[in-house]
Structure formats: structure tokens, C-alpha cells
Amino acid sequence: DDIMAMNPSGQVPVMRLPDGRILPQSNAIMLYIAVTHRGQDLIPVDPFEHARMMSWLFWEQYSHEPYLAVRRFRKKFLNQTDEELDPQLLARGRRALGVMEMQLTFSDYFVGQSMTLADIGLVAYTRVAHEGGFDLSEFPSVQRWVARVETDLGIEHAKKAA
């Protein structure tokens, strides 16, 4: 189908439900799947913890993804050099990784004592940040968290296959 017919913003991902309804945006899709399938344990029941999870998901979309994902895309898929890239992508991406490092210095996950959708949303681009020129060795708590979440999700070997 034409992506514009499914999502007027022209963005992917888009999920078509069995009844034909369309749901755009990765975090909305992730929430829908968790609620309608076995992922309820990934969403905190406590209203405050639920709101904290949502806060991290919003933060990912506005303060993390625009820098880590965009820089990775331009380096890996458009073959742009560091000199061609906006230096703010690296600076702001490093700032985002620093925020994550501070949080993960005191906890194993972003919300509570177990993995939530916040961790799943944040790990996607963080685990491949090196492809955008980010050195995760500068963020040891983030590195340990990536390994932990990859193991929790059973995807620790997926990078090697990609």
C-alpha cells in the first residue's frame, strides 16, 4: 500500500491490524503489542512508574533518536564522513548517552527493577550507536545495560548476524 495512505506523515513503521486499522509510530506500536499480547509485564502497573516509563519513551523520541539514529543513518547508509556530518549530532548524541549513563549508574533498568518498554525503546539505536561514531566505552553503565537488555530479549547475537 502507499505509505501516505497509511500514515499521512509518510513515516515508517506502520502496522496494519487484522481488522484493517492502521497504527503508526514505533512506540505506539510497541505499546499496542505489549498490551494486546503477552507483554503486560513490560508496562509498570503503578501509575507513577508507568508515567516514568512513558517519560523515557518520550525522551527517546525527542532527545535520543534524532541524534543517534540520524547520525548512524547518515554514516552507515549515506556514507557521509565525519566532516560532512553536523557536529551537533555527535555532541547531542553524546549528551543523550551521558543522561543514560547517569540513570544507569544507579539502576539496572530505566524504570524499576526489571525491563520495561522504556528499555526496549532505548536499546534499539543505542546498541548500534557505534555505527554512528559513538564510542560506548565512554559510557560503561550504558554498555552493561545494552548487554543486559540484549540478553533479556535474546538478541545478543543479532549484531553479529547483521
Regions found by a protein language model. Give the residues of each.
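GST-like domain detector, emphasizing the conserved glutathione-binding G-site
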Residues: 1-87, 91, 101
